[in-house]
Amino acid sequence: MSPADRSPSHHRSRLKGYFAGALALSWMGSTGMAADSPGIATLAVHFVGLKSSQGAVMVAVFNSEAAYENSGTASDAATRSLKLEIKDGTASATLDGIPPGEYAIKAFHDLNGDAKLNTNLFGIPTEPVGFSNDAPVHMHVPSWKETVFVVHTGENAISIHLD
């Protein structure tokens, strides 16, 4: 090792190189590289037709029927929970690095910002709700079977209306 290799400026230069390489790798991963890897998927979720930009869209993503059916309106059993900002009547999120498989989504437009699905005395939501596959609400939460969709390796997308 030469004296130049032991200098502080040489070590700083090497550290900058490592940092730049790590930054480039993380940027490539965030732009879809992970979705091209075997067994990895990206899911873009779009909520459309929102009647107000007030509040946020609260999202719970489930990867099993048991978690979905036992969650009620809480997101504690969810694989991923998100709070999305609303812009121009839409809200979107991209879930990177998820395993391919079956998923279902429950969401609601939290109009008053209390992070809870508000209901009337009979338990009927007073805030707009939506489910994957735009499964309709008929006096009960749609079942896993009605809401389940398959995420494949690579890029996937789903749109959900909140009513």
Regions found by a protein language model. Name each.
Residues 3-19:
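Bacterial N-terminal signal peptides that target proteins for export
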Residues 58-62, 106:
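Beta-strand signatures of extracellular beta-sandwich domains
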Residues 95-97:
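Short, flexible loop/turn segments at beta-strand junctions in immunoglobulin-like
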Residues 41-49, 59, 160:
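A short, amphipathic beta-strand motif
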Residues 82, 89-93, 145-147, 156-158:
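Short strand-edge motifs at loop-to-beta-strand transitions and within beta-strands
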Residues 14-30:
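Bacterial N-terminal signal peptides
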Residues 111-119:
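Acidic, glycine-anchored loop motifs typical of Ca2+
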Residues 101-107:
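A short tyrosine-centered beta-strand micro-motif
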